[in-house]
């Protein structure tokens, strides 16, 4: 799953997406500045607009959804 997230992070243009967790939680990633995926791939860091951040185990990520509205509008 981290490989999929890396592809989204490096996409040009960046398209916002949501990470869905196994426990039903979800975290929105509105910009590339709101996420970091270290080289090891076992964890994902998602940053809020405030000083808050979440450290996720990649094993707990159940799916990723791309913001279709942003994806459509970015292509003109």
Give a label for each model feature.
Residues 1-76:
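Motif-centric detector for short Cys/His coordination patterns
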